[in-house]
Amino acid sequence: MGSFSIWHWLIVLLIVVMVFGTKKLKNMGSDLGSAVKGFKDGMKDGGQSAAATDDKPAAPAGQVTNAQASDKTTIDVEARQKS
């Protein structure tokens, strides 16, 4: 009694076909299929690109010196006065 029989599912399917129509259901099915295919392709491509980047060593980080850190065009916010 608690579960649905095959007849319940057939009636639900018939009502859905009557409401949406077969053409609309076909379009929704093909859109869903292409979305799933695109997702799978994206996951496959993501795994290959991640494996390719793991093989290369990272470039060494550059060291910042005082000459680079103090730029003449920067403005100290606290020293600036409102006009």
From Swiss-Prot:
Gene3D superfamilies per record: 1.20.5.3310
Stretches assigned to coiled coil: none
Localisation per UniProt entry: Cell inner membrane
Natural source organism: Polaromonas sp. (strain JS666 / ATCC BAA-500)
Transmembrane segments: 1-21
Cell membrane found in the keyword field: yes
Record-level Gene Ontology MF annotations: protein transmembrane transporter activity
Amino acid composition bias (Polar residues), ranges on this chain: 63-72
Family designation: Belongs to the TatA/E family.
Its job: Part of the twin-arginine translocation (Tat) system that transports large folded proteins containing a characteristic twin-arginine motif in their signal peptide across membranes. TatA could form the protein-conducting channel of the Tat system.
Protein name according to UniProt: Sec-independent protein translocase protein TatA
